[in-house]
UniProtKB/Swiss-Prot annotation:
Keywords: Cytoplasm, Methyltransferase, rRNA processing, S-adenosyl-L-methionine, Transferase. Belongs to the RNA methyltransferase RlmH family. The keyword Manganese does not apply. This is Ribosomal RNA large subunit methyltransferase H. It catalyses: pseudouridine(1915) in 23S rRNA + S-adenosyl-L-methionine = N(3)-methylpseudouridine(1915) in 23S rRNA + S-adenosyl-L-homocysteine + H(+). It is found in: Cytoplasm. Its main location: cytoplasm. InterPro entries: Alpha/beta_knot_MTases, RlmH-like, tRNA_m1G_MTases_N. The keyword S-adenosyl-L-methionine applies. CDD domains: RlmH-like (cd18081). GO terms for cellular component: cytoplasm. GO terms for molecular function: rRNA (pseudouridine-N3-)-methyltransferase activity. Homodimer.
């Protein structure tokens, strides 16, 4: 069982230890974590850049995966609601590029992709990856009744 996280840019070396710590905690739930790091396009036209990067994302989504895109216009979920998304053997989370993604192209090409939000704040990619990993661990802890999540 695998969780893929598609994002842009490589992970800074100093953050790899933090990612690995969270990944190791997730492994106890029999899931592997795969980072799919894409290169941002240097296109100056922002709409064209978003379209090209969205096409790159669509090509990298693993087959037979339940897929979710993080976007500020997505559905805001609680940790308990997020844990319910972890009921599939293969899951893919997408973190768009610095200008986001072409959401219309995503919706047209893959209407099965859910749009999620962790709130109205904007995060650096390196921080958001860590937040996603922590929420995956928290979600599994909720799902399997482990003592980690204390809120209702």
């Amino acid at each position: 069982m695998k969780i893929s996280i598609i994002s842009f840019g490589s992970s800074p070396r100093e953050w790899l230890g933090l990612y690995k710590k969270e990944i190791n905690k997730i492994k106890q739930f029999k899931y592997q974590i795969e980072f799919i790091n894409l290169s941002e396009h240097s296109q100056e036209n922002i709409e064209l850049k978003k379209m090209l990067e969205t096409k790159d994302i669509l090509q990298k989504i693993p087959k037979n995966s339940s897929c979710y895109l993080f976007t500020e216009r997505g559905k805001t979920v609680t940790s308990k609601e997020f844990s319910q998304l972890l009921n599939f053997p293969n899951i893919c989370f997408i973190i768009g590029g610095s200008y986001g993604v072409d959401e219309k192209l995503i919706a047209k090409s893959r209407p099965d992709i859910g749009f999620l939000s962790f709130g109205k704040l904007t995060f650096a990619h390196k921080i958001f990856k860590l937040i996603v990993l922590e929420q995956i661990y928290r979600g599994f802890s909720i799902k399997f009744n482990r003592k980690y999540h204390h809120a209702d």
